[in-house]
């Protein structure tokens, strides 16, 4: 389910966001109006989506983070194909990995999911 189409571009964006979190955001007071923070929102989207579509959603999120917005809980939303039960059972037996994200279906459609980090 991870985005593997353009790993180089995703790695560049992810490294720049992690650098921002480590060197700039760590030294400023916490003032984010949303949960998850805009930088975590960006990292989660880059994990699941192509970098270009993720950057569009990230830009909208950053523009909505202003004094006139009330903020709140706003999880990123992504589109994914639901895996078949047989395929996921085969994958489960072969390569078991720890759960990092929950994908919670939205009420809008069967292919859009909220991304929630465990």
UniProtKB/Swiss-Prot annotation:
The source's superkingdom equals Bacteria
Please name the SMART domains in this protein's record.
Haemolytic (SM01234)
Location relative to the cell: Cell inner membrane
Main localization is membrane
Q: Which UniProt keywords apply?
A: Cell inner membrane, Cell membrane, Membrane
The chain's disulfide connectivity reads none
How does the record say this protein sits in the membrane? Peripheral membrane protein
InterPro entries (UniProt xref): Membr_insert_effic_factor_YidD
| GO CC terms of this entry | plasma membrane
Q: Name one Pfam family in it.
A: YidD
The family annotation for this protein states:
Belongs to the UPF0161 family.
| Function field | Could be involved in insertion of integral membrane proteins into the membrane.
Protein name as catalogued: Putative membrane protein insertion efficiency factor
**Annotated source species:** Helicobacter pylori (strain P12)
> What lineage does the source organism belong to?
Bacteria, Pseudomonadati, Campylobacterota, Epsilonproteobacteria, Campylobacterales
